[in-house]
Design a protein with these regions (language model features):
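Carbohydrate-active catalytic/glycan-binding domains of CAZyme proteins
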Residues: 1-201
Length: 201
């Protein structure tokens, strides 16, 4: 959908889906330093494609993110349910909800990981096209929620991780609330482990 203002009115830009497939959820857009925009998405699968300047079409189609099936890229294999096939199969730690950023020439992809319940993990790469290297855990499984989708930003020289949990009254897996924690990157550029705080920020 497109609009001239964040408050709308919104309208369907192309009259149909940009991409269709099983697990095609949780999209995120990353705009690189050269102005090129990329769309990432996926659940039990991970895809990406460069967008045209109109931001509503792919330049050269889309494909699976290189290394998605490689434990070195997205964490050790574990048995997960493939809902499309109706049976378990061995998959990497990546589960869903990719979020891509860039810092000091390094690309960071954080994502919900490990199946259900999810924790937040991440991988890094020297290029938007990979190769990706699994770097471990950023946050533990969310409180009172079986999912934990997140994304970090830098604002006025400070770093913040936004995520969701089920801590509000009557909250649970399908009644989630947004939360945010401030953090500082480690000296080597890696994410620190970010604990939950009751007060958040």
């Amino acid at each position: 959908a497109v609009a001239d203002s964040p408050t709308g009115p919104w309208k369907d830009a192309i009259g149909g889906p940009l991409a269709t497939g099983w697990g095609y959820i949780d999209p995120t857009v990353f705009i690189d330093d050269d102005g090129k925009a990329y769309l990432f998405w996926g659940n039990k699968g991970l895809w990406y494609g460069e967008l045209n300047d109109d931001m509503i079409s792919f330049k050269d189609g889309y494909k699976e993110v290189p290394g998605y099936h490689d434990p070195k890229s997205f964490g050790e294999l574990q048995s997960k349910m493939n809902w499309q096939k109706g049976e378990n199969e061995m998959m990497t730690q990546f589960e869903e909800a990719p979020w891509v950023t860039k810092r000091n020439g390094i690309y960071y992809m954080s994502y919900a990981a490990g199946g259900v319940p999810e924790y937040m993990g991440y991988s890094t790469a020297p290029s938007i096209h990979g190769p990706w290297t699994f770097r471990g855990r950023i946050m533990d499984e969310a409180i009172n929620s079986f999912t934990i989708h997140g994304g970090d930003i830098e604002f006025k020289g400070r770093n913040f991780m936004f995520y969701h949990n089920g801590l509000l009254p009557n909250g649970e897996g399908f009644r989630r609330s947004s939360s945010v924690e401030e953090f500082t990157f480690n000296e080597d550029g890696s994410f620190p482990f970010i604990p939950f705080t009751k007060e958040e920020i």
